[in-house]
Amino acid sequence: MLTAVCGSLGSQHTEAPHASPPRLDLQPLQTYQGHTSPEAGDYPSPLQPGELQSLPLGPEVDFSQGYELPGASSRVTCEDLESDSPLAPGPFSKLLQPDMSHHYESWFRPTHPGAEDGSWWDLHPGTSWMDLPHTQGALTSPGHPGALQAGLGGYVGDHQLCAPPPHPHAHHLLPAAGGQHLLGPPDGAKALEVAAPESQGLDSSLDGAARPKGSRRSVPRSSGQTVCRCPNCLEAERLGAPCGPDGGKKKHLHNCHIPGCGKAYAKTSHLKAHLRWHSGDRPFVCNWLFCGKRFTRSDELQRHLQTHTGTKKFPCAVCSRVFMRSDHLAKHMKTHEGAKEEAAGAASGEGKAGGAVEPPGGKGKREAEGSVAPSN
């Protein structure tokens, strides 16, 4: 068919060398529809709209007469068509991508051919993104191996976020001198270093809680702690006597300010518990199931909890009784000591009674009563 067309064109060229071609009814080319993969979309034509209208590709082209391209300096002959090879530039090369060497080659080509011996990622000093080789097909579609790279080429990556391993070309990724590096100590480490002396001070204050009982109050009371406002403390503060109202070494007592009470305690905690008894406040609640009883003092709550658990760890060495609290056992031991004193006093009283002189006439009276004979 190509030979017949060439023959007809050659005969027309010899007969009418200066015949003008008829006006062609041209239609603009449609956009290229990719058929290599179902995921491929519409891709625009590489030609401009003006060039599309100037191409002689209409459906009613008559090859019986010679024709020439608008704007071309020479006519197109059969020899020109035959001489156009897939690799030689010709009038149809405008329809192809500049990088394409064949008419039916894919519209997308890999921009960087992959190396077989390269790693799965490669850093280039002149680029701003990591170029993925095409040997790994996990991130590229089979129909368009370079589609992903064409989309990633316009982005500007942050190399500090990528954090690649040491690379001979990765020296440009390091920040300039004076900048903050990701591998440097964060601000949180500095905050921890600042907070270290505070934690040491807290540990030293906690160690003070484990000191002996006599050395706890060697340090004067700080301003943040509450001061007892009982009448005795107020009087001592007014007189300026630290040990007591009389200024001696007598133990200072904290008395109740309620009129008519007058109870005094050696510890402020005991006075506060006593004042809660006056006010009716019971802040200590039993959390046992279905109990919910409230108490004024914490030791009362602990004693109540032992009734739930049934634990009694203070047995009496004299009798078989067991107590929940040591003070209860000490009070119980006093009963045993009192019983011993009573027994000792009773024994001494019996001894005194045995050595005493009997009243006169007593023995004779018994003998008289015993010697009386029964009457008939």
Curated annotation (Swiss-Prot):
Transmembrane segments: none annotated. Its main location: nucleus. Keywords: Amelogenesis imperfecta, Disease variant, DNA-binding, Metal-binding, Nucleus, Repeat, Transcription, Transcription regulation, Zinc, Zinc-finger. Residues 333-343 have a biased composition (Basic and acidic residues). GO terms for molecular function: DNA-binding transcription factor activity, RNA polymerase II-specific; RNA polymerase II cis-regulatory region sequence-specific DNA binding; zinc ion binding. Ubiquitous. A motif (9aaTAD) lies at residues 118-126. A zinc finger (C2H2-type) spans 254-278, 284-308, 314-336. Gene3D superfamilies: Classic Zinc Finger (3.30.160.60). It comes from the Eukaryota. It is found in: Nucleus. Residues 1-70, 167-223, 333-376 are annotated as: Disordered. GO terms for cellular component: chromatin; cytosol; nucleus. GO terms for biological process: epithelial to mesenchymal transition; odontogenesis; regulation of odontogenesis; regulation of transcription by RNA polymerase II. Residues 173-186 have a biased composition (Low complexity). PANTHER family: KRUEPPEL-LIKE TRANSCRIPTION FACTOR, TRANSCRIPTION FACTOR SP6. Belongs to the Sp1 C2H2-type zinc-finger protein family. Promotes cell proliferation. Plays a role in tooth germ growth. Plays a role in the control of enamel mineralization. Binds the AMBN promoter. The 9aaTAD motif is a transactivation domain present in a large number of yeast and animal transcription factors. It is linked to Amelogenesis imperfecta 1K: A form of amelogenesis imperfecta, a disorder characterized by defective enamel formation. The enamel may be hypoplastic, hypomineralized or both, and affected teeth may be discoloured, sensitive or prone to disintegration. AI1K is an autosomal dominant form characterized by hypoplastic enamel in all teeth. This is Transcription factor Sp6. It comes from Homo sapiens (Human).
